[in-house]
Amino acid sequence: VWDGSVSTNWNDANNWTPAGVPTLADCVVVPNTANDPIVSGASYDALGLNLTIQNGAVLTVNSTNDIIINDWVNINAGGDLQLNNNASLIQINNNSNTGTMHMDRTVNMRRLDYVYWSSPVTSFGSNAISPGTSAGYIYKWIPTIGTNTNGWGNWSATSETMVLGKGYIVRGPDSFTNTLQNYTQNFVGVPNNGIINMPISRGTYDGINYSTGVSTTLATKDDDNWNLLGNPYPSA
C-alpha cells in the first residue's frame, strides 16, 4: 500500500507499507495521501500484480517510464492514472480494466499537417481528437470505396467513436500556423487491454495495373489491400 510518507517517489521503499517497492507479485493500492506517487527516472519500470487507485488518488507515470501490471487495473471514481507523453501502461495478462485514466500524446505539427491517431481507451470519439480542427478534416481509410473507375480506396470523413485498432488521420488545429509547434492530445477513458481483433477489408479490383491520376507510379490490384491500423493499447 502506498503511503507517501517520505516523498512522491514510487521507487523509494519507505513510501510503502510494508516497506519495499512493489514487484510483479504484489497487489498495489494507491489511496488518497498528501504525496501522490510519481513514476519517474530514465526508462524506469514500476511493477505490480494488480493496481487499485482509490478515490482522490492520482498515480502519474512520467515520460519514457512504464508501469507493468500482471493482471488488472481498477481506477475508482475520483481516482486517476495519468500517463504523460511517451509513458506506457503494459499488462501481461488479458484482464479487463475498470475506471478512467488520462493519457497524453504530443506531436510536432503545423496547421496543414496530418497525424495518424489510434485510441488507447474505450469509447473515445474521433471528433475529440484535436477539437480545434474542423470536422471535415478527420478521416478514416476505406479500401472498398472507389476513387476512380478501377475502384481503389479513399479517405472518408468521420465523426464516429474510434474503433479499437483502427487508424485515423486528423489535420492540425485551425488556430495553428505554418510554424511547427507541439500539440498534446489527452485520451480519457478505460485503458484497453487483452486481445483486440481488427477486421481487415479490401476492394474487389483484380485487373491490370492502372493510373491513379495523382502519380506516375501505376497502382496494382493489390493496392486496395491497404488498411490503416493503429496501436490500441496505452503504450508508447
Q: Residues of each region from the PLM?
A:
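N-terminal exported-region signature
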Residues: 4-236
